[in-house]
């Protein structure tokens, strides 16, 4: 299915690109999220007439994400307390929701879908550097300190 991208999508394209994607991906994700429109003649004409407005909106979102990234990078270590055993192993784990809530409580709004934990949830007491993806091009690093209660 041919779609016109209204936003930069990783591994797919950027604003204004006409790309061929699977119909389920377009119908269930790209179009409902407002990230793409079907590539009909009417939509192509509509996109060309609104191109400057959409590019300005994308640039504004990128600038806002960069500002949030600077705020996240400027944060001191975020402390999360959890029950732990004698050897420092946690009862349970610290996941993306816990980290996002702690960063938000520290003053920078972050959703759980923006927190990246490539090695999985944190299961031990200690200091960690957690990657936060605020935009498809903007990453920040948050320092997280997990302590025993």
Swiss-Prot record:
InterPro entries: Ribosomal_bL9, Ribosomal_bL9/RNase_H1_N, Ribosomal_bL9_bac/chp, Ribosomal_bL9_C, Ribosomal_bL9_C_sf, Ribosomal_bL9_N, Ribosomal_bL9_N_sf. One of its GO terms (molecular function) is structural constituent of ribosome. GO terms for cellular component: ribonucleoprotein complex; ribosome. One of its GO terms (biological process) is translation. The keyword rRNA-binding applies. Keywords: Ribonucleoprotein, Ribosomal protein, RNA-binding, rRNA-binding. Coiled coil: none annotated. SUPFAM superfamilies: L9 N-domain-like, Ribosomal protein L9 C-domain. It holds the Pfam family Ribosomal_L9_N. Belongs to the bacterial ribosomal protein bL9 family. PANTHER family: 50S RIBOSOMAL PROTEIN L9. Binds to the 23S rRNA. This is Large ribosomal subunit protein bL9. It comes from Vibrio cholerae serotype O1 (strain ATCC 39541 / Classical Ogawa 395 / O395).
